[in-house]
Curated annotation (Swiss-Prot):
InterPro entries: Restrct_endonuc-II-like (IPR011335), tRNA_endonuc-like_dom_sf (IPR011856), UPF0102_YraN-like (IPR003509). Belongs to the UPF0102 family. This is UPF0102 protein Adeh_1910. One of its GO terms (molecular function) is nucleic acid binding. Gene3D superfamilies: 3.40.1350.10. Transmembrane segments: none annotated.
């Protein structure tokens, strides 16, 4: 397992990469098709771009070493949501446009003792970056 989220930047980055890899595998096992990873634009970043049936899904992955300070999903606020939406818009415009069904999900990965815990929050925020109802 990667270093703690509260440590140095390299440890946080390693934890994030490990969480993203685990989230991608978890989603793929459930039938999601992974189209892209770590899509960066000047306006933001999307961790995973997937297809869930006919729906284009943009996934923000959040990882922590414990849930002691709340779940990783709680760290996705409106500003982060808007940045994901902006990067997702750029991606969609280059891959079929905005006329397709689009959803914004969060996958929370908590590393601790034993197996990592993966939680999926479909439609975690809307196209304006506002939190959904989990």
């Amino acid at each position: 397992m990667a270093g703690g989220a509260g440590g140095d930047g390299d440890g946080r980055q390693a934890l994030g990469r490990e969480g993203e890899a685990l989230a991608a595998a978890w989603l793929a096992e459930r039938g999601f098709r992974i189209l892209d990873r770590n899509h960066r634009t000047r306006r933001g970043e999307v961790d995973l771009v997937c297809r869930d049936g006919e729906v284009l899904v943009f996934v923000e992955v959040r990882s922590r070493t414990s849930g002691a300070q709340g779940g990783p999903e709680e760290t996705v606020g409106p500003l982060k949501g808007r940045r994901v939406v902006a990067a997702a818009t750029d991606w969609a415009l280059g891959h079929g446009g905005l006329e397709q069904a689009i959803r914004f999900d969060v996958v929370a990965v908590t590393f601790g003792d034993g197996e990592p815990r993966v939680e999926h929050f479909p439609a975690a925020f809307d196209g304006d970056g506002r939190p959904g109802h989990w």
